Amino acid sequence: ATLREIETRLKSIKNIEKITNTMKVVASTRMGRAQRAMASSRAFREGDSDFFATAETSTPETAEKTLIIAVSSDKGLCGSIHSQIAKATRAKLQETPNADVVTIGDKIKAQMLRTHSSNVVLSFNGVGKEAPTFWEASLIADEIRKLGDYDKIEVMYNKFVSGVAFEPSVFPSFSPISIEESPKLSEFELEEDQAIPTSLSQISLTNAILNAMAEGYASEISARRNAMDNASKNAGEMINKYSILYNRTRQAVITNELVDIITGASSLD
């Protein structure tokens, strides 16, 4: 490579390093907000879990209609986080090949349409730019309810484990019938209203979606920060490598020019 080619390559890598460093800083500043949203959403979902555990709510052993809600986002540059949830969703479809799928996020939508387009019945995008809100989750839950009743609903999402780890996970969202047939629902002092199971199911679904989106958002921000950190380190190593190559090539050019000058001067003598 010529000296100019090496110099151009070196400038390009330095620009990439600036971009990845900036993205890492942005991800780091968003991490605190993401963790607060995740902690808040966990409190809602854990409240639901305690309620249904006490009521001994369960899904039917043989479900005629199953819905899988796969939660991801629209943004990339965050490692394998989207492909992992797509892989887990496909594994679920191996168990229930006739299940309907709702995708939340363009990334999971694109991956599922490539392999299971006939299963995808509804998709949402515009998610993952900011920490999710209850209002967003409620709007999504309302649209999902318009699909009709399902015997079994499972929410697939990336669970935040630590700053360097996440894992594809799943939790159920119960149908009105499952709630109504809970063996110990009578232990709660609920009003005699036929709409209560439906209301509880809707709130539970909203909380499940909110928590899945919040966990996924925190996992994604963490994964992006780590990916940009690794990219910055790799760029730094390449900068050192090309700097050494540039200096050696430059020294060789100078040496050759000196040899030419000395040779020319000698021939004049």
From Swiss-Prot:
Coiled coil: none
InterPro entries documented for this protein: ATP_synth_F1_ATPase_gsu, ATP_synth_F1_gsu, ATP_synth_F1_gsu_CS
Gene Ontology cellular component annotations, sorted alphabetically: mitochondrial inner membrane; proton-transporting ATP synthase complex
GO molecular function: proton-transporting ATP synthase activity, rotational mechanism
Localization per Swiss-Prot or TrEMBL: Mitochondrion inner membrane
Pfam families per UniProt: ATP-synt
Gene3D superfamilies recorded: 3.40.1380.10, ATP synthase, gamma subunit, helix hairpin domain
Membrane topology of the entry: Peripheral membrane protein
UniProt keyword Transmembrane, yes or no: no
Subcellular location, principal: mitochondrion
Keyword annotations from UniProtKB, A to Z: ATP synthesis, CF(1), Hydrogen ion transport, Ion transport, Membrane, Mitochondrion, Mitochondrion inner membrane, Transport
Domain of life: Eukaryota
Recorded family membership: Belongs to the ATPase gamma chain family.
Role this protein plays: Mitochondrial membrane ATP synthase (F(1)F(0) ATP synthase or Complex V) produces ATP from ADP in the presence of a proton gradient across the membrane which is generated by electron transport complexes of the respiratory chain. F-type ATP synthases consist of two structural domains, F(1) - containing the extramembraneous catalytic core, and F(0) - containing the membrane proton channel, linked together by a central stalk and a peripheral stalk.
Assembly description: F-type ATP synthases have 2 components, the catalytic core F(1) and the membrane-embedded component F(0), linked together by a central stalk and a peripheral stalk. The central stalk, also called rotor shaft, is often seen as part of F(1). The peripheral stalk is seen as part of F(0). F(0) contains the membrane channel next to the rotor. F-type ATP synthases form dimers but each monomer functions independently in ATP generation.
The protein's name: ATP synthase subunit gamma, mitochondrial
